[in-house]
């Protein structure tokens, strides 16, 4: 479902006639509400049957996607704002489900097989998503060529909805070994207390502000790459898809390289390298509109974002105090980032709305031929400032004693407009000790 919905959100908003200011809302508001929903989900966990809650949310999410497809067919006057509202609900349901699904899978999949299972699942998901992404681009290009792009979008979202309904039905058939979590009083209060305690950690505070700040500055320009490609360069939908895949595929194939590099030299060095590369990405779009050049830029961005995403995820696990609640640190960092993304996207929308008038007033329009270029330049400058602020404050985490050899299992949750591939931690699992014990018994 992700490949036929999330990846086309910006393109769909442009098709519906979203203004530059509204593009900021399309990116920022769903991210903000999604994060709030994930925090709410922690509290809801003790009040509902886990399987039923997940199935109901999945079915409602499918209904939301079906509604998105209906917008393309009927095109009401306020279609863009209706789409933004549906996107908010879509992200909300995803994030309500996520913590429950993560806990459920953690109980079903044997601990010794989690790494192999989720590695295989990630490969299968990526192949399926990219295949459907290509097919979706082909459908949109074909229908757009006969002036019926609305039909292409309606088909895509209808297919995505049917896939989600099927997913909900399959989830309903699954066994849940712990259908209802025990009710614990004061869960919300305890969560807030854990957040306050985590925020007192200086290293974690600097890290969180860095990641959130970088995503904020990226969000300034993130919604407008699709606008530039589809509206200004007049890419076909298939060309648009291919340029996006160039980044996503590069991220996927370079994750292993960055993983080995960080094992050798540390996550801090990878963060420093990639945080110096990321500011240059919007600036590169100013130099040429050649399609092959843009594919090269996208591939380069995939390399940078792959290392940044992986190293920041690993760094968070490394810097948390020993025996502390990793879920609290991850939830707080995600919530902060979502809030900053909302601010950045709103700021980007305002800048884009007034960029043309500003360029004419200053006379810079002779140099910057497209108002969106001003958004790209401001995003580059602000990303650089965030990197310059964090690098002298970053520390290499000291190795802490561990009673067991542990590994943090990540899965690729999907793709987003901010950083492409989105990683999600699943669990902390014993790496080899269990296997060694079995051999000792033999």
Language-model segments: residues:
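Helix-loop boundary and gating motifs at the non-cytosolic
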Residues: 1-36, 41, 61, 66-67, ...
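Juxtamembrane intracellular "pre-TM" segments in multi-pass secondary transporters
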Residues: 175-209, 397-442
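Intracellular juxtamembrane helix-capping segments at the cytosolic ends
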Residues: 94-109, 307-322
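Structural signature of the two symmetry-related core transmembrane helices
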Residues: 52-68, 161, 269-284, 380
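Helix-to-loop junctions at the C-terminal end of transmembrane segments
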Residues: 37-52, 140, 253-266, 352
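Helix-loop junctions at membrane interfaces in 12-TM secondary transporters
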Residues: 70-87, 284-298
């Amino acid at each position: 479902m992700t490949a036929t919905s999330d990846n086309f959100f910006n393109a769909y908003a442009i098709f519906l006639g979203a203004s530059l200011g509204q593009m900021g809302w399309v990116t920022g508001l769903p991210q903000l509400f999604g994060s709030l929903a994930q925090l709410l989900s922690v509290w809801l966990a003790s009040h509902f049957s886990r399987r039923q809650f997940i199935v109901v949310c999945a079915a409602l999410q499918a209904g939301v996607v079906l509604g998105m497809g209906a917008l393309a067919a009927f095109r009401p006057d306020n279609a863009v704002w209706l789409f933004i509202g549906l996107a908010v609900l879509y992200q909300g349901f995803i994030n309500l489900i996520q913590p429950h699904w993560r806990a459920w899978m953690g109980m079903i999949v044997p601990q010794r097989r989690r790494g192999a299972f989720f590695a295989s699942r990630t490969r299968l998901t990526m192949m399926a998503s990219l295949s459907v992404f290509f097919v979706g681009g082909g459908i949109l290009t074909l229908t757009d060529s006969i002036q019926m792009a609305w039909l292409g979008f309606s088909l895509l979202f209808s297919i995505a909805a049917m896939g989600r309904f099927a997913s909900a039905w399959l989830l309903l058939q699954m066994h849940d070994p712990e259908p209802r979590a025990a009710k614990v009083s004061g869960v919300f209060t305890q969560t807030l207390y854990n957040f306050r305690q985590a925020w007192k950690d200086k290293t974690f505070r600097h890290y969180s502000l860095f990641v959130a700040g970088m995503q904020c500055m990226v969000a300034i320009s993130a919604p407008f790459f699709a606008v530039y490609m589809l509206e200004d360069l007049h890419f076909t939908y298939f060309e648009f898809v291919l340029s996006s895949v160039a980044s996503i595929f590069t991220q996927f194939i370079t994750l292993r390289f960055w993983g080995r590099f960080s094992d050798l030299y540390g996550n801090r060095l990878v963060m420093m390298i990639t945080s110096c590369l990321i500011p240059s990405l919007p600036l590169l779009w100013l130099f040429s509109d050649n399609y092959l050049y843009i594919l090269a830029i996208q591939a380069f961005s995939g390399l940078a974002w792959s290392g940044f995403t992986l190293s920041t995820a690993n760094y968070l696990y490394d810097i948390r105090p020993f025996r502390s609640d990793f879920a609290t640190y991850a939830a707080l960092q995600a919530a902060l980032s979502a809030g900053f993304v909302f601010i950045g996207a709103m700021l980007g929308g305002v800048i884009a709305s007034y960029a043309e008038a500003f360029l004419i007033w200053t006379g810079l329009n002779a140099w910057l031929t497209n108002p969106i270029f001003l958004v790209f330049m401001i995003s580059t400058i602000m990303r650089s400032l965030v990197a310059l602020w964090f690098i002298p404050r970053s520390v290499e985490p000291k190795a802490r004693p561990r009673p067991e050899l542990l590994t943090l299992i990540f899965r690729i949750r999907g793709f987003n407009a901010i950083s492409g591939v989105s990683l999600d931690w699943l669990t902390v699992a014993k790496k080899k000790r269990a296997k060694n014990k079995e051999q000792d018994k033999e």
